[in-house]
Amino acid sequence: FLVEKCTELGVRKFLPIVSQNTQTKRISIERLKKHIIEAVEQCGGNFVPEIQTLNTFQNVLDNFPDNRKILFCDETLEYENIQNTLNQLDFGKVGIFIGPEGGFSLNERRMVEKNSEVVRISLGKRILRAETAAVSALTSWHSKSGDWTK
């Protein structure tokens, strides 16, 4: 569901990560690719998003492109309207980090706090499933940045 909806919303690349609270280590990249292609066909898209191999949280964070901010969806962050946060920022391409069931660990939060490219955002007072959080974050970003395909 997550890759389908995110593909429909214009995501260009998926970086599946294993964090300390990830429930399964057996994510089938091939199965996800099939879902991505189905979503592209369904919505009439003109590009197929890339999906990288499963990687660790630390490795993705350490190797994230320097020219992009990371929107870190943090359910422990005191609620602040996401649009207010996004409107204060001036940047182009972003990566959005969505946590697993159980959220990001304290250790992972500490890693994020040390990274100057990370912007912590709240998706509201509710604890959302990863799929819902992804759609919510992408929709909020899309309302700030306009159409990603420009």
Predicted regions: what is each one?
Residues I70-M111, E117-S122:
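Active-site/ligand-binding-proximal alpha/beta "capping" segment
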Residues L9, D74-T76, K150:
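Beta-strand/loop-alpha-helix module characteristic of Rossmann-like adenine-cofactor folds
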Residues F1-F72:
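RNA substrate-binding interface of SAM-dependent RNA methyltransferases
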Residues K25, P49, E101, R126, ...:
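Glycine- and other small-residue-rich loops at beta-strand/loop junctions that grip anionic moieties
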Residues N55-L61, E78-E80, I127-L128:
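A short acidic, often aromatic-flanked loop/helix-cap motif at beta-alpha or helix-coil junctions
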Residues L106-K150:
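Structured adenosyl-cofactor binding patch, chiefly the S-adenosyl-L-methionine
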